[in-house]
C-alpha cells in the first residue's frame, strides 16, 4: 500500500511513512487508497484482541507478512504489558452505555494501546528501509503520550527518545512517571510553555533540512511517536473494531447495528481512529467529540470554523489542553474529498491567521459523522461524583468529560438514547488524585500517594502495580527549559549518544 501526504501527491511505501513520521511538505501520511468497507463482522467474531489486531493492521500495513505481523502484535499485547487478557475490556455502565477501558497497559493510559506496538513497527520499518542511522524519537506530550512512548522505546536497540512536556500542563502523577523513567536511551525535559508550543516546534523541526543534515552527519535521524505518525494512529483503530465485536458478543447490539462513540480528545487522534474504523466498515453511527474548556473542536463542529485565537486553559483534564489538534489535518483531508491542495491551503490559513473554515458542502460532510460538546472543570467533578455515587464506577477526569458530553448530546438529541453508546475511557483515575479527591470530597493528602491511599480506602479501587512501585523510584529528569532552547536540548542529547 502506498501512503501520500495530506498536502501533496508524492507516494511512499508503508515502511517509509512509519519511519519518517511526517511528510517532507509538512503534511501527514494517509493511505493513498483507503481500504474502505473492508471489514465484515465474520472477519472479527470470536477472535482475541490480538487476532482482531492482525486482521485490521493487515489492511493498513500489507507490507508485513502475516507471521511477522502476528509476532509483533503478540509481543506487544502480552500479559507482561497488560493487566487483563481482554486488553481493552468493555464495562457495562448502563443498559445502553458501555465504557471502553483503554488504561490497562503499563502506563495506565490509552496511549499504551498504540505505543506498545509502535516500537516493533518502527524497528521493522527501519530494517525494511535498510536504514543504518540511529533513530531519535522526538515526542511532545500533554501528559500520557510521553510516559507511554518512553516505556515503549526504553532500551530498544537503535533508538533513542526525547520527550518534552509543559511544566504546568500535566498532572503531578503524570510528571512523576516521566521524571522517574528508566532506560539508558531516554531523555525527558520540561518546558516553560504549553503542549502546543512543544508540538509546533517539533513539527517545524521535522521539516528543517539543515538540522536533519546536521544530525545525519552524526549518524542520527529524527522520527515521531506522536499520532502524526501513522504507526501511532493505526493500532488505535483496532480497539474500536474489537469493541464492535465485543458489543455483539455481549448481546448489546446485533450484527451491523449502529452504535455511537464518545471520545475525549485534544489532538484528535483517538477520535480519528474511530472514524477510520467506521470507514473500514464498523457500523459506528455518530462520533461525539468531547472537549474540556479548550473547546476549539466543539466550536468547529457547531460552526464549521476552527479558530485557535482564544485563551488557553490549564484544566483538570490536562491531556486535552490543546488548541492545535494535529490529527485534525487528516480529517480535513477526508472532508475535502481527499483534496491535498485544499488541505494545504487550510493549513496555510491556520498558520497565518490562526483559523480556518470549511464551506457549506464540506460542513454537511462533517455533520453527517460528527458532533461535539464540551465540559468545564466544575461539571467534570460533578460527573465523577454522580457516576461514582450512582453506579459505583470511578472515572478519571478525561473519561468524565466524555460522559458529560454524552449527557449533553442526549439532552439535545433524545433520540440518541435508543442507540448503544461507547464511552472511551482514556486513563486510570489514580493518575489524577487531586481532582478525584475534590470530586468525591475525600481528604487530599500531603503527597499524591497519600491522596491515592485515601481514595482507595473510600472507593475500594486498588493501586495499579506500576503506580504503587513508582513511589520508591528515584527522580532522574528534573530539568526545565525555555521553549526557545528545545533545539539545543535535542542537539545536546544527540551529542551524548552519538559519540
Model-derived segments and spans:
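PLP-dependent amino-acid enzyme catalytic core
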Residues: 1-499
Amino acid at each position: 500500500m502506498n501512503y501520500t501526504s495530506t498536502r501533496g501527491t508524492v507516494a511512499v511505501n508503508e515502511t517509509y511513512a512509519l519511519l519518517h513520521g511526517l511528510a517532507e511538505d509538512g503534511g501527514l501520511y494517509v493511505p493513498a487508497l483507503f481500504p474502505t468497507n473492508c471489514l465484515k463482522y465474520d472477519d472479527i467474531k470470536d477472535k482475541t484482541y490480538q487476532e482482531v489486531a492482525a486482521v485490521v493492521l493487515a489492511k493498513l500495513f500489507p507490507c508485513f507478512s502475516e507471521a511477522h505481523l502476528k509476532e509483533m502484535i503478540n509481543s506487544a499485547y502480552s500479559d507482561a504489558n497488560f493487566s487483563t487478557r481482554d486488553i481493552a475490556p468493555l464495562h457495562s455502565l448502563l443498559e445502553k452505555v458501555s465504557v471502553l477501558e483503554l488504561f490497562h497497559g503499563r502506563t495506565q493510559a490509552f496511549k499504551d494501546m498504540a505505543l506498545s506496538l509502535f516500537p516493533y513497527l518502527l524497528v521493522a520499518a527501519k530494517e525494511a528501509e535498510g536504514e543504518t542511522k540511529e533513530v531519535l524519537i522526538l515526542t511532545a506530550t500533554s501528559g500520557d503520550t510521553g510516559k507511554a512512548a518512553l516505556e515503549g522505546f526504553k532500551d530498544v536497540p537503535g533508538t533513542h527518545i526525547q520527550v518534552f512536556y509543559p511544566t504546568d500542563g500535566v498532572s503531578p502523577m503524570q510528571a512523576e512517571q516521566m521524571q522517574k523513567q528508566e532506560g539508558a536511551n531516554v531523555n525527558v525535559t520540561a518546558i516553560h510553555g504549553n503542549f502546543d508550543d512543544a508540538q509546533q516546534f517539533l513539527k517545524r523541526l521535522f521539516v528543517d533540512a539543515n538540522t536533519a543534515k546536521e544530525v545525519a552527519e552524526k549518524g542520527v535521524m529524527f522520527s515521531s511517536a506522536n499520532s502524526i505518525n501513522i504507526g501511532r494512529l493505526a493500532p488505535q483503530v483496532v480497539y474500536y473494531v474489537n469493541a464492535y465485536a465485543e458489543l455483539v458478543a455481549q448481546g448489546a447490539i446485533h450484527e451491523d447495528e449502529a452504535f455511537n462513540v464518545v471520545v475525549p480528545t485534544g489532538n484528535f487522534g483517538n477520535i480519528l481512529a474511530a472514524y477510520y474504523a467506521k470507514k473500514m466498515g464498523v457500523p459506528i453511527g455518530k462520533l461525539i467529540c468531547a472537549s474540556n474548556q479548550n473547546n476549539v473542536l466543539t466550536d468547529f463542529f457547531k460552526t464549521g470554523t476552527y479558530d485557535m485565537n482564544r485563551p488557553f486553559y490549564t484544566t483538570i483534564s490536562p491531556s486535552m489542553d490543546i488548541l492545535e489538534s494535529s490529527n485534525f489535518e487528516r480529517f480535513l483531508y477526508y472532508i475535502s474529498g481527499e483534496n491535498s491542495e485544499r488541505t494545504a491551503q487550510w493549513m496555510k490559513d491556520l498558520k497565518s491567521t490562526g483559523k480556518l473554515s470549511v464551506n457549506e458542502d464540506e460542513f454537511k460532510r462533517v455533520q453527517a459523522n460528527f458532533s461535539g460538546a464540551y465540559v468545564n472543570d466544575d461539571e467534570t467533578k460533578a460527573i465523577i461524583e454522580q457516576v461514582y455515587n450512582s453506579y459505583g464506577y470511578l472515572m478519571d477526569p478525561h473519561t468524565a468529560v466524555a460522559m458529560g458530553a454524552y449527557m449533553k448530546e442526549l439532552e439535545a438529541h433524545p433520540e440518541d438514547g435508543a442507540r448503544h453508546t461507547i464511552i472511551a475511557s482514556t486513563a486510570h483515575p489514580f493518575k489524577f488524585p487531586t481532582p478525584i479527591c475534590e470530586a468525591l470530597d475525600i481528604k487530599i493528602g500531603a503527597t499524591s500517594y497519600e491522596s491515592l491511599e485515601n481514595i482507595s480506602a473510600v472507593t475500594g479501587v486498588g493501586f495499579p502495580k506500576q503506580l504503587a512501585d513508582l513511589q520508591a523510584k528515584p527522580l532522574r529528569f528534573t530539568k526545565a527549559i525555555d521553549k526557545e532552547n528545545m533545539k539545543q536540548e535535542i542537539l545536546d542529547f544527540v551529542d551524548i549518544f552519538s559519540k
